[in-house]
From Swiss-Prot:
GO cellular component: cytoplasm
InterPro entries: RecX_HTH_1st (IPR053926), RecX_HTH_2nd (IPR053924), RecX_HTH_3rd (IPR053925), Regulatory_RecX (IPR003783), WH-like_DNA-bd_sf (IPR036388)
Subcellular location: Cytoplasm
Keywords: Cytoplasm
Any single biological process term in GO: regulation of DNA repair
Signal sequence, renumbered to the chain: none
Protein task: Modulates RecA activity.
Highest rank taxon of the organism: Bacteria
Gene that specifies this protein: recX
Organism expressing this protein natively: Clostridioides difficile (strain 630) (Peptoclostridium difficile)
A Pfam family the protein falls into: RecX_HTH1
Protein family (similarity comment): Belongs to the RecX family.
Protein name in UniProt: Regulatory protein RecX
Tagged with keyword Secreted: no
Keyword Cytoplasm: yes
Amino acid sequence: MGIITKIEQQKRNDDRVNIYVDDKFFIAIFKELVYTFNLKKGNEINEEELKPILDDEMYIKAKNKALNILSHADQSEKKLKEKLSSEFDENIIERVIDFLKSYNLVNDSVLAQKIVNTNVNLNKCGKNRIKQNLYNKGINRSTINEAVSELDKDTEFENAMYLAKKRYERVKKEDKKKIYQKISQHLSYKGFDYDIIKRVLNKLLNFDEYDI
């Protein structure tokens, strides 16, 4: 292919260099690859030697993009792969994921627990809504089931009661049947099971579904 005749630092990017072969611009790469592949002026470079350089160039680009994405918000493995797939090949993405996992920057179990805690403590969601939110974030079914398996039933009941009381203040002037229906629908939307909804309504309103 030719002889490397110059390796030039880019003026506007300290992390990148321009490689010239036979006195003509050949390629721009990350500076660290010069050391990784021991590239020097006077070295001959051929097609076989170029491929791993280009692969590592794409790997660094993909890794940098992934780190930038993660700097804004935690991502599941699935969602991060989806965001990288428009620009990078699968083998490059897998290398990036392996790197991120090695530093615990991508960990679906940890992410799932964070989402559960936020949904329970801040958003007052029930188990069904939490499971759907986890699925929407790209968490797999087994990790979802593990994350919600330790949900505290008393806390879930307290959250449902809190939401029911707030909704009751908005609908308390309506007739008994409508109050029951509207609170029930709201709690169902928030992801609570029928049994919890029934217990909440019975305690809050002193009647159950058979009274209406």
